[in-house]
Every structure is written in C-alpha cells, then in structure tokens.
C-alpha cells in the first residue's frame, strides 16, 4: 500500500492505537497533506476501549547516521512527552529551516497536518513521462522550479519543514506504540525514519 504516511500521522497524533483501515493499493493523496484525514478522524470520533495503551519509552539515545550538520542523521533521546526537532537545508526557495513540534504545546491539526508534500518540476515531469505517477500528482504537491514555487501559495512560510515533520510522525506510527521521547532529525527522509523505527523496535523487544 502506497502513500500511507499522512494517514498514519493523523492516526498517531489522534492517539489511535487500534484501528482497521480498508484501502486499495494507494491511500488517496488528496492535497498532499494530512488535513483531511485529521478532520475526518475528529468528525468520526475516537472510542475509548477502556484499556491503557502501551508506550514506547526511550531510556537511552538511539541514533541513525552520524551527528554532523552536513550529513543526514536522526536520533531519539529520553524526554517526558513527545517532541520532534527538525532541520532541513535545500536549494532555493526552501533554504535552511528549523522547527520544533511538541505534542503537549503545539496543535498537530493546525500547525503540522495542513503542510503539503513538495517536489521539483523536473522530478515530477520525469515521473509522469515514465508513468510512475498520474496527472493528479500535480494537484497534491508544492512544485518547485528555478528557485520558485510555481503552482500554489504556501500555507506557511516554512511549510516544507512542517511537512517533513508530518512524514516523520507518520513513519513513527509503524512502531505500533505511542513514543515517549524526543526525536532530533537533520535532512532525513523516509528511509532514515524507518531505520530508526527498526532500531527502536529492536531496543523494545530485546
């Protein structure tokens, strides 16, 4: 099943630990954000099943990659609550951005869920020519070309890093438990996020 991370991020931040999702081979990408999923979950409501949910409690730092500013890396460390600190640095119009999302103090539905996927026109054009994405891809991404956003207005000045945090939160849902810890990420992608989940799973089961 493809494009699951936005739905998983909404489920994660809604505190849902027991859910059955019936889907086709791909989750609808809608507008490239998690906004619609979060709104539908809120509209449907969440049932308290009367059983305390287990937590994945980080007791010691776990790391993927080397802690160097110029290299992709991320790590998780003990923290009372859930927090994500992210840094990205891409060519214009994105540049260097840093942002912290704290579950207790920030609103996922307002601050993170509306942030959309982004890609370059060149990457999208190539993918369409090779048939790996359809025309609807253009409506679900912020498209970048020649140092500019060419197809939409940004919802936030730093929408790009907000979406990277959204993706990371969705990938962490693969752990199967709410995470109690702080995740610090530098220029990471799904591969690094999922590698951290695998390391966390090993630490929790050994």
How would you name each of these model-derived features?
Residues 1-17, 22-206:
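C-terminal regulatory domains involved in ligand/effector binding and gene-expression control
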């Amino acid at each position: 099943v493809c494009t699951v991370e936005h739905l998983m991020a909404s489920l994660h931040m809604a505190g849902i630990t027991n859910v059955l999702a019936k889907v086709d081979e791909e989750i609808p990408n809608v507008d490239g954000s998690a906004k619609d999923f979060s709104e539908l979950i809120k509209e449907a409501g969440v049932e308290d099943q009367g059983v305390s949910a287990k937590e994945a409690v980080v007791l010691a730092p776990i790391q993927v990659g080397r802690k160097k500013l110029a290299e992709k890396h991320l790590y998780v460390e003990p923290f009372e609550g859930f927090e994500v600190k992210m840094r990205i640095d891409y060519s214009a119009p994105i540049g260097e951005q840093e942002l912290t999302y704290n579950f207790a103090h920030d609103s996922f539905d307002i601050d993170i869920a509306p942030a959309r996927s982004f890609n370059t026109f060149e990457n999208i054009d190539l993918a369409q020519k090779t048939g790996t994405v359809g025309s609807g891809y253009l409506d679900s991404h912020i498209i970048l070309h020649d140092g500019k956003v060419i197809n939409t207005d940004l919802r936030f000045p730093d929408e790009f890093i907000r979406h990277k945090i959204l993706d990371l939160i969705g990938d962490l849902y693969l752990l199967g438990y709410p995470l109690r810890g702080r995740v610090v990420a530098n220029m990471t992608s799904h591969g690094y996020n999922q590698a951290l989940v695998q390391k966390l799973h090993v630490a929790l089961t050994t």
